[in-house]
Curated annotation (Swiss-Prot):
Species assigned in the record: Thermosynechococcus vestitus (strain NIES-2133 / IAM M-273 / BP-1)
Induction: By stress conditions e.g. heat shock.
Job description of the protein: Acts as a chaperone.
Protein name: Chaperone protein dnaK1
UniProt similarity note: Belongs to the heat shock protein 70 family.
Modified positions (Phosphothreonine) in chain numbering: 197
Length: 651
């Protein structure tokens, strides 16, 4: 059995880890970072960039750079108006009212975009481990709906991963914290504020059991919202100073977003920071520059409502667990946004104790997912751990009068199954419509509908006589199945809830195959880019030789070498050339350079050779003739990881 990786698929950044020798290890990406930006970009010629490479070119390619896709996954069009207004890329209605992303002449589902990020993490893990990776544990916010969980699982399948388990992010963080504290009985509060979501979970740890007591949260609150507060302030200040509205300028907005994120990070360690964006725009009087000073106190004033919004879920989670604040033994801060001093102070005041800082807030969730992978893979060091998670929202049916009747209450331990008996609402009724909802509101339509199906063939009878058993079954991933059985006839109907407007198994397989093809195409493009870098070094060596010694070369020799050089130059701009063809032309050019180097040596060193020993002459000739190739090899080595991009990199 191969390694099972743990993935924290975040709104702004993602992280991958694995259990090695019983210890969780964060896997660095190809660029050397321990986290990878959850960003996908499409270049001018259709090339796909993921992670740091995509982030670097976002300013000059804002419309084709996709970020915060996690805010759209598994959600319907009408639910995402606010999020759609905040991104520069085009969102379009997808199938069954879901959200798709339009890039030039093609649309992508959020699952496909997420799969591209997952595929990058998978490739980095394979490079690190030196073996194929096919299985993973992926984390989601505790307050993710059934539809969002299923969509995340679909994204994993598209990326070529068998998702063994979907677990909640706060629960994963508790595993990272408690892996070496299994002998301690304690109640912990996990405060998880990431880039786009916020969760609070209360867990009971002891004797190798990690039991979630309750969970609460807000899927619309995260670090992105703090960034947007700064962006809105910058827009207002600049409009007041210069009379220019930057809100419709996508390139300027992307620069403001990056500057806002940078300022937010800096204000976690300093009391004031400068935001300087030269040439942000221009009018008839010339270019305009944005120069502003942002203090921590001003930042906290701008974001005070966001900080306060974290209070209610904490109160709810503690109440649902049947505890008081005083009974909380430890408070864990998870997610990069918990570095904001105002957040730390609020948590400290609410809980009456300093938060525990023993886990890395950026890496804890991925580490916990890797530990869960070890549990599923029966790793010796963790095989006896038991993780008991809960469902974050109540699940039930619409009954007579549009009332929402709960079958499974929120914070029920998973996996679980519950059956409730219903009857018909009118005489002679032969069909029952079963509408499944998720939420806490008393009226069904105010909650999120997950599915709707019919049980037919019910024997005609007076109202209230037929007995229909409806069973709700939630697996360990938090994914729901519903079945209905008529006791009299034995007729049964069931449905495994996948998000309405979600992907069928055939669509997932098609997208998975496309992702594999794209991965192969991307690999070929990377290989061609690397070969062209090597070829460029050879051409440079040729041009240098001609510049310094061309006058001494015979026309016949130049006529013989020139077609080889021209063939190599043509390969540098041919979009349809294959790696094998480039290698073939490079070999021809290398042979030509060896010949050229030998002739140059004989012409420049011929006089001294007459007085040198034959052995020295041969050694000198060998050195001179291969000098070009040696320098070329050095250049090749230095450019191993180079990727050609059409866009300017802006740090």
């Amino acid at each position: 059995m191969g390694k099972i990786i743990g993935i924290d698929l975040g709104t702004t950044n993602s992280c991958v880890a694995v259990l090695e020798g019983g210890n969780p290890v964060v896997i660095p990406n190809a660029e050397g970072g321990r986290t990878t930006p959850s960003i996908v970009a499409f270049g001018k010629s259709g090339e796909r960039l993921v992670g740091q490479l995509a982030k670097r070119q976002a300013i000059t390619n804002a419309e084709n750079t996709i970020f915060s896709i996690k805010r759209f996954i598994g959600r319907r069009w009408e639910e995402t108006a606010q999020e759609r207004a905040r991104v520069p890329y085009a969102c379009v209605p997808g199938r069954d009212g879901m959200v798709d992303v339009q890039i030039r002449d093609r649309t992508y589902t959020p699952q496909e975009i997420s799969a591209m990020v997952l595929q990058k993490l998978k490739q980095d893990a394979e490079a690190y481990l030196g073996e194929p990776v096919t299985q993973a544990v992926i984390t989601v916010p505790a307050y993710f709906s059934d539809a969002q969980r299923q969509a995340t699982k679909d994204a994993g399948a598209i990326a070529g991963l068998e998702v063994l388990r979907i677990i909640n992010e706060p629960t994963a963080a508790s595993l990272a914290y408690g892996i070496d504290k299994q002998d301690q009985d304690q109640t912990i509060l996990v405060f998880d504020l990431g880039g786009g979501t916020f969760d609070v979970s209360i867990l009971q740890l002891g004797d190798g059991v990690f039991e979630v007591r309750s969970t609460a949260g807000n899927n619309h609150l995260g670090g992105d919202n703090f960034d947007e507060c700064i962006v809105d302030w910058l827009l207002a200040c600049f409009k007041e100073q210069e009379g220019i509205d930057l809100s419709k300028d996508k390139m300027a907005l992307q620069r403001l977003r990056e500057a806002a994120e940078k300022a937010k990070v800096e204000l976690s360690g300093t009391l004031s920071t400068s935001i300087n964006l030269p040439f942000i725009t221009a009018d008839e009087t010339g270019p305009k520059h944005l120069e502003m000073e942002l203090t921590r106190s001003k930042f906290e004033e701008l974001c005070a409502h966001l900080v306060q919004a974290t209070l209610e879920p904490m109160q709810q989670a503690i109440a649902d667990a049947g505890l008081t604040v005083e009974e909380i033994d430890r408070v864990l801060l998870v997610g990069g946004s918990t570095r904001i001093p105002a957040i730390q102070e609020l948590v400290k005041q609410f809980c009456g104790k300093n938060p525990d800082r023993s886990v890395n807030p950026d890496e804890a969730v991925a580490i916990g997912a890797a530990i869960q992978g070890g549990i599923l893979g029966k790793e010796t060091t963790v095989k006896d751990l038991l993780l008991l998670d809960v469902t974050p929202l109540s699940l039930g049916l619409e009954t007579l009068g549009g009332v929402f009747t709960k079958i499974i209450e929120r914070n029920t331990t998973l996996p679980t199954s519950k059956t409730q008996t219903f009857s018909t609402a009118s005489d002679g009724q032969t069909v029952v419509e079963i509408a499944v909802y998720q939420g806490e509101r008393p009226i069904a339509k105010d909650n999120k509908q997950l599915a709707c199906f019919e049980l037919t063939g019910i024997a005609p009878a007076p109202r209230g006589v037929p007995q229909i058993d409806v069973t709700f079954d939630i697996d360990a991933n938090g994914i729901l199945s519903v079945s209905a059985v008529d006791r009299a006839t034995g007729r049964q109907q069931s449905v495994r809830i996948t998000n309405r407007g979600g992907l069928s198994s055939m669509e997932i397989e098609r997208m998975r195959q496309e992702a594999q093809i794209y991965a192969q195409v991307d690999q070929i493009k990377k290989e061609i880019a690397e070969l062209r870098n090597q070829a460029d070094a050879l051409l440079y060596s040729y041009e240098s030789t001609i510049k310094n010694h061309g006058i001494t070369l015979s026309p016949e020799l130049r006529a013989r070498i020139e077609p080889v050089v021209q063939s190599m130059q043509a390969a540098m701009v041919d979009d349809n050339i294959t790696p094998d063809e480039i290698r073939k032309r490079m070999e021809a050019l290398q042979q030509a350079l060896v010949t050229l180097g030998s002739v140059v040596y004989q012409q420049t060193a011929g006089g001294s050779m007459m007085t040198s020993t034959p052995t020295m002459g041969r050694a000198t000739m060998s050195s001179q003739a291969t000098q070009v190739l040696d320098s070329e090899a050095t250049i090749i080595s230095d450019n191993e990881e180079t990727v050609v991009s059409d866009y300017e990199a802006v740090d």
